């Protein structure tokens, strides 16, 4: 029987679009919904509530191919004592270095990993342990360029490729679940975890404590990113931390035994 994680790192997300904190629905920019008046104040609020880490995505950068919201990202990083990981439009060694020099803990690359594997490898060598790959997929097929393009590449295949190139970890997002609160794609996550030799963080669709407990039962999964579930009030950060974070008080319900299959 494979081991389960003792706990998950529960990571609030802040997605930046035109300087605002928003949430998308299934990756659709036309359905962007503002979720906070001030991204910096929201970041500080998550940290004050006990978040161990913050996940920031520059949606403008993901679309354009170059980070757009750098001033806001810098203010977030400088205002927090917790680590911040950033993705969106990081497609060069220079941009990765710039973000890390600002104090970002991890950079997350997506399109680069698919389209420019040589630069990915150079990046992982230049910044060991600090380059993660975001694998975003529709029906198992990897999407790039801010989720606007879908490739024939299957997610597990990309996992194997990028870990061989030195990626420190994987953030897997099921686009069809993102922003829906419909639950994570456990079957696809199992396929990712079956081939991954690096830490994996799940994102997309998490809408309840039951979803988090289901994720906790998956072997080698180390974290979960929460967006709409927190902003809609479906889950409070404190509840999530108590359920699956370090020192959690809630055991797995018996029915999650089926998740081993």
UniProtKB/Swiss-Prot annotation:
Its EC number is 5.3.1.16. Keywords: Amino-acid biosynthesis, Cytoplasm, Histidine biosynthesis, Isomerase. Coiled coil: none annotated. InterPro entries: Aldolase_TIM (IPR013785), His_biosynth (IPR006062), HisA_bact_arch (IPR006063), Isoase_HisA-like (IPR044524), Isoase_HisA-like_bact (IPR023016), RibuloseP-bd_barrel (IPR011060). Signal peptide: none annotated. GO terms for cellular component: cytoplasm. The active site is at residues 15, 136. GO terms for molecular function: 1-(5-phosphoribosyl)-5-[(5-phosphoribosylamino)methylideneamino]imidazole-4-carboxamide isomerase activity. It is found in: Cytoplasm. It catalyses: 1-(5-phospho-beta-D-ribosyl)-5-[(5-phospho-beta-D-ribosylamino)methylideneamino]imidazole-4-carboxamide = 5-[(5-phospho-1-deoxy-D-ribulos-1-ylimino)methylamino]-1-(5-phospho-beta-D-ribosyl)imidazole-4-carboxamide. Belongs to the HisA/HisF family. This is 1-(5-phosphoribosyl)-5-[(5-phosphoribosylamino)methylideneamino] imidazole-4-carboxamide isomerase.
């Amino acid at each position: 029987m494979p081991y389960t994680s003792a706990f998950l790192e529960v990571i609030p997300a802040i997605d930046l679009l035109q300087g605002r904190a928003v949430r998308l629905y299934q990756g659709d920019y036309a359905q962007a919904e503002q979720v906070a008046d001030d991204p910096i104040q929201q970041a500080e609020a998550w940290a004050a509530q006990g978040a161990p880490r913050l996940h920031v995505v520059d949606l403008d950068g993901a679309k354009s191919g170059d980070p757009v919201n750098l001033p806001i990202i810098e203010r977030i990083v400088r205002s927090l004592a917790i680590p911040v990981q950033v993705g969106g439009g990081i497609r060069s060694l220079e941009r990765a270095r710039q973000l890390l020099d600002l104090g970002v803990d991890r950079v997350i690359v997506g399109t680069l990993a698919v389209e420019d594997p040589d630069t990915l490898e150079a990046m992982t060598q230049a910044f060991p342990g600090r380059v993660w790959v975001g694998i975003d997929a529709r029906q198992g097929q990897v999407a790039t360029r801010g989720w606007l393009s879908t490739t024939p590449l299957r997610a597990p295949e990309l996992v194997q490729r990028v870990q061989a190139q030195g990626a420190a970890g994987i953030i897997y997002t099921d686009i069809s679940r993102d922003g829906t609160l419909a639950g994570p794609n456990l079957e696809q996550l199992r396929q990712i975890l079956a081939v991954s030799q690096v830490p994996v963080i799940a994102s997309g669709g998490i809408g309840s404590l039951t979803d988090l407990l289901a994720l906790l039962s998956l072997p080698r999964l180390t974290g979960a990113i929460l967006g709409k579930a927190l902003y809609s009030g479906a889950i409070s950060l404190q509840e999530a931390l108590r359920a699956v974070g370090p020192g959690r008080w809630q055991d797995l319900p018996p029915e999650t035994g089926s998740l081993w299959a």
